[in-house]
């Protein structure tokens, strides 16, 4: 998976507010499966700790279903997803070279 959305760029940042986790194990029906291209909220161990960070599934991740709030699906750009997934990373899986999302379209 590819994770982003940290305003501090450290991997630990977020906003001042958290979002209630909208997934099955937290009492909210969410039938969107974590398949390749699905976008979901990142969080800590606390199910209601989602903030600004999100991740995009590079491969199918069915083990996340029911425990993470999937909320969107990519419709194109899978070649870019593959390119980002192939970028060299450090031992903490952070890319050596910063990656940025330049445009997003929500439909």
What are these regions (language model features)?
Residues 1-107:
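Cyclophilin-like peptidyl-prolyl cis-trans isomerases
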């Amino acid at each position: 998976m590819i994770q982003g959305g940290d305003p501090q760029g450290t991997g630990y940042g977020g906003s001042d507010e958290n979002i209630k986790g909208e997934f099955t194990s937290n009492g909210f029906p969410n039938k969107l499966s974590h398949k390749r291209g699905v976008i979901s909220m990142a969080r800590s161990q606390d199910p209601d700790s989602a903030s600004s960070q999100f991740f995009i599934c590079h491969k199918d991740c069915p083990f996340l279903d029911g425990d993470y709030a999937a909320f969107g699906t990519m419709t194109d750009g899978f070649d870019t997803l593959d390119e980002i997934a192939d970028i060299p990373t450090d031992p903490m899986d952070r890319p050596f070279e910063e990656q940025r999302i330049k445009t997003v379209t929500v439909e």
